[in-house]
Structure formats: C-alpha cells, structure tokens
C-alpha cells in the first residue's frame, strides 16, 4: 500500500509516567493490537448545541439540528524505553500537561531543523509587561528574519524544514512535536524512537546555543521549591535585613507621573504609601506583627492603588505579581518577574552583573521624599546644579512622524542625562531606549541639532542660564560623540537607596543600550538618585454612625 503524507502530534511522557497517569478524568484507555504494547482512547467531545445558539434564542427544534460533537483519538506507544502520546483531533486537551516533558517538541526541532529553512517562531519577551508574538515568513529563512533578541527572548515554538528529509518534510515543536512525513500506522513506533533520539542530542548548540540562556519555568515541583525560597526570604525580612535581590515593581506598564498612592492589604493594615517599595510592605507587616510569612500570603496579600485618603482608586494585584526576586536553586539562577519564574544561564547572569559594576558612576542630586520624575526634574531645574532641564522639550527628527526628548538634563560638561523612576523593568527599558535613540539622532541629524539649539536658547532665557547652547554642535559644525557622555539616572527610594542593584531583565537591557552607545562612539555612565522612603499615612476611616431610635 502506498504511504501517504501524514501529520502527527507527538508528546513524550515524563520518565516513569504511565498512560493512565497522563490523561484527564473520564478518559478510558484500552489495549490496541495494531501496535505492540500500545493503548488507545477514542471518544467525542461535546454533545450539546453551540454556545451561540443561546444568543440567537433558538427553539429546541432548532437546537436539535446543531448537535456539536468533536471526535478525538489518543494512542500511547512504547518506544526506546519511554511512553509517547500521539493525539488526533482535540485529543491533546484530554492530556495532563504535567505528565509530559516540557519543550520536548522544541528540542527535537532545534536538533533536526535546517537553520536556514525556518518558517515560524513563537517568541515571548519576559518583563513586567510580558509580550508574546508569532513571526512567520513567506519563504525559508534563518533566525535573523525573526528579530529574536537572544539575551531577552524566550522561543516557545519553532517550525521549519528538517536537514534530513527522511526524518520529516516539516517539523514544528513546543511541548509537543508536530511532524509531517510519508508513513503508515505501523511506522509510528519508529517515528517516536527517532524523535526521542533527536531529543537527546545537543546538535542545536551549533546554531541555537543561546536558546538555553533564559527558560520559563513551568514544572510544578520546581515552582514549589522556588516559591518556598521566596517565602523564606520574605519571612527573613520580618526580623532581619531586606536582601538586595528582593524588590517590588508594578506588573504593568505604569505611569509614575500619576498621582497614585498604594496600600498593602490582606493583614489589616491601613497605611497609605506614596511609592511601591519592598521596605514599605515589610514595615507594614512588622507594624501589624505578622508572626511569620506563609505561602498563602503570596496570593492573600494584595497591592491596591488608592487616593491620598486610602480609598481604592485604580487597579489591584496579588503581591506575588509585584515581587521581583532572584535566587539560586541546585546551582542554577532563577528570577521571578511578573508572577513568572525564569531559569537564567549562570554565565549570562554573571556577565550582565559584572558589566553593570564596571560602568562609570555619575553623581546626581538626591530626590526628596514623594518626588516622582516630573517633580524631581522641575525642582532640580531651578536648583543651581549646573544643568539645563530639557524635560518635555520635544524636537522632531528629520523625516520622522514623532518628536523625541534629547535628554532630561544637559549638564554644563555636555553630558546628556536621562531620568526615570525605578518603578518597573518596562519603564527602565524605555529609559535605556530613549538614550540610544537620542544619541543616534544627535549624531546623524544636523537639522535636529539646530532645532534643539533653539529649544536650548529658549530654556536658557526662561531659566536665566547661559553657556548651554554652545555645547551642542550645529549642522554646520563637526559633531563629536566625545563631547556628550550619556548618563542613565534612576530614582530609587527606601532601603538601600543609592546602593540598589537593577533587576536582572533591566541589567540585560542596560547592557544592550550601553553597547549600542559605545558602537556609536559614546561613553556611558549610570547614576542612582537616592530618595528617602515614601511617606506613610493612615487611611481615613468612615465615622461610625449611631442608630437613631424611631419613636413608636
């Protein structure tokens, strides 16, 4: 019989798992004599009318015409000393994800795909505002076509054509492996064995070694151990010092210029804070004499946006969604960010930390308690600090449809200083990007510099300052990158202000920005702007009303 091209979806059970351990309740397995030792489950999903029938308010007679049934099949095959699940239809929804090897399909694809014949990639960029995207190409391409940031992005899925066509004509993989090849049912055990052999190789390191630098942790047992380490660290804060590996950050892109306050709820505390910071959270727990930090607090304690009186006025998040934490487990580095755990390659972690430690430090005036970026810039602008404030003084680059800020401050040394609050990695990523964009435009766009010089002259007049316009070369004058040190300045408050360390993902984006600046010919520096701990007040409580007796 002629073999036809068939597409199958294969998953690998964890070592020691049996078919009965890997299916959801209600799935009945039976021996299948078509393949030696195999087991099979066949059934349908559904049985009732579709949900949209309610919207149309259909009669029973009309609904009877719309019985919605979907068939599925699961075949469990023993091969190479392990069990494999081959799913058909919606069979995969009847499988327990925790019973299967994570990234099995991705690893097989990485080891078998032709690196110049990729077709699509599913990519996740971890941050406080994690983004996911699928990129597809119209023709065979190498990895450069997918704009993968090898120091930040996680590849969750990959598809392409294998180097050896005998293995398959097309492969795609994430946790499961989907492959297309000419075969009949009798070939399934060998197909599974070949996939398992590819899974065990490390050929991928020749072209995709960076894939192991950052991994999203999804194994429940590992997450439990990491959560336990987080709970232990928070428990230690109740009686001891707060480690510099523990922070709080907004889990969304947050505008620090909003006049928001926050409260930590879940342990009967009424304090109102002007900043989200780990020191305030710990102080509140100490004030309420929380005896020990328990696992349930990670979801039971919450952060609420509120007004100055403590009334809820905005969003809220579980405290774990806001925690940023770095720890080691079994010799490997892990990072918690936006409620997700990531395993970080130790070499990468050490490299970005060492890089940051070697960056030139720059001195900036301290911030006052409760100052955000806007208030800080406004006060320093008139404080006689040998800096001209250009905050919000936008200039449009030649041919651009948008305007940019050259910097927040132009120092009398020529340094261009960019300022942001340490509220989240996403805000800091914006800061680092702002610096590189500005530096590139300054270098390449003479007319932009002319417009900027006009802006500077206006500010000099407004603030009664002189000498700053001459620091920026006009379009008719040679431009010197050496004349402009690019400084990233981050406002940090609370415990360790001025000696803080950036969260891991911020360190990664900082190194990328600094290297780009160096490639453009600039030097780069970093400044911590120390700010006292945020002000704490008590939420105003509604006065109790005395019931008024009604005369009989």
Describe these PLM feature segments.
Residues 422-463:
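Catalytic cores of nucleic-acid endonucleases
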Residues 3-5, 24, 80, 90, ...:
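Extended catalytic cores and adjacent scaffolds of nucleotide/polyanion-binding enzymes
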Residues 1-157:
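Long, charged/polar, low-complexity intrinsically disordered N-terminal extensions
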Residues 408-421:
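Conserved catalytic cores of phosphodiester-cleaving nucleases, focusing on short active-site segments
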Residues 61-71, 431-441, 463-474, 507-513:
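Short, charged, amphipathic alpha-helix that recurs within catalytic cores of restriction-modification
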Residues 344-404, 527-530, 537:
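Catalytic-core elements of nucleic-acid end-processing and repair enzymes
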Residues 150-368:
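Long, charge-dense tracts
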Residues 55-69, 193-196, 382-407, 476-478:
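Active-site metal-binding core of divalent-cation-utilizing nuclease and nuclease-like domains
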């Amino acid at each position: 019989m002629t073999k036809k091209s068939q597409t199958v979806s294969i998953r690998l059970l964890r070592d020691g798992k049996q078919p009965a351990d890997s299916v959801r309740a209600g799935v009945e397995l039976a021996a299948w004599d078509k393949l030696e030792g195999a087991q099979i489950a066949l059934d349908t999903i559904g049985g009732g009318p579709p949900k949209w029938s309610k919207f149309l308010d259909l009669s029973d007679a009309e609904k009877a015409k719309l019985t919605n049934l979907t068939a599925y099949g699961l075949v469990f095959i023993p091969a190479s000393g392990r069990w494999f699940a081959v799913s058909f239809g919606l069979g995969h929804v009847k499988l327990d994800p925790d019973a299967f090897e994570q990234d099995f399909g991705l690893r097989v694809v990485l080891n078998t795909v032709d690196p110049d014949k990729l077709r699509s990639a599913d990519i996740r960029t971890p941050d406080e505002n994690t983004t996911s995207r699928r990129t597809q190409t119209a023709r065979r391409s190498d990895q450069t076509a997918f704009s993968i940031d090898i120091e930040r992005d996680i590849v969750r899925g990959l598809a392409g054509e294998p180097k050896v066509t005998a293995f398959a004509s097309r492969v795609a993989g994430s946790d499961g492996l989907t492959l297309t090849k000419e075969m009949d049912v009798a070939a399934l055990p060998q197909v599974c064995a070949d996939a398992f052999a590819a899974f065990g190789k490390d050929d991928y390191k020749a072209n995709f070694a960076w894939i192991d630098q950052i991994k999203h942790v999804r194994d429940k047992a590992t997450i439990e151990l990491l959560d336990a380490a987080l709970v232990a660290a928070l428990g230690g804060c109740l009686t001891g010092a707060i480690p510099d590996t523990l922070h709080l950050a907004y889990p969304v892109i947050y505008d620090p210029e909003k006049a928001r306050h926050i409260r930590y709820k879940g342990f009967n505390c009424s304090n109102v804070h002007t900043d989200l910071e780990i020191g305030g959270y710990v102080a509140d727990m100490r004030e309420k004499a929380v005896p020990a930090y328990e696992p349930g607090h990670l979801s039971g304690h919450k952060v609420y946006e509120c007004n100055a009186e403590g009334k809820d006025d905005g969003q809220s998040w579980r405290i774990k969604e806001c925690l940023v934490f770095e720890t080691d487990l079994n010799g490997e580095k892990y990072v918690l960010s936006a409620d997700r755990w990531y395993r970080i390659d130790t070499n990468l972690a050490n490299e970005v930390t060492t890089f940051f430690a070697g960056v030139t430090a720059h001195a900036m005036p301290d911030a006052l308690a409760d100052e955000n970026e806007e208030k800080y810039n406004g006060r320093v602008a008139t404080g006689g600090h040998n800096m001209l404030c250009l905050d919000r003084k936008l200039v449009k680059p030649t041919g651009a449809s948008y305007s940019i800020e050259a910097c927040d401050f132009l120092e009398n040394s020529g340094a261009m200083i960019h300022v942001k609050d340490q509220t989240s990695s996403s805000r800091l990523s914006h800061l680092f990007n702002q610096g590189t964009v500005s530096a590139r435009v300054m270098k390449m766009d003479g007319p932009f510099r002319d417009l900027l010089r006009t802006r500077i002259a206006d500010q000099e007049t407004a603030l009664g300052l002189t000498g700053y316009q001459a620091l920026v070369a006009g379009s008719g004058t040679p431009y010197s990158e050496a004349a402009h040190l690019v400084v990233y300045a981050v406002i940090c408050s609370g415990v360790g202000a001025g000696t803080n360390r950036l969260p891991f993902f911020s360190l990664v984006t900082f190194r990328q920005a600094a290297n780009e600046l160096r490639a453009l010919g600039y030097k780069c520096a970093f400044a911590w702007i120390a700010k006292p701990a945020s002000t704490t007040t008590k939420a105003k409580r509604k006065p109790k009303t005395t019931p008024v007796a009604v005369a009989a």
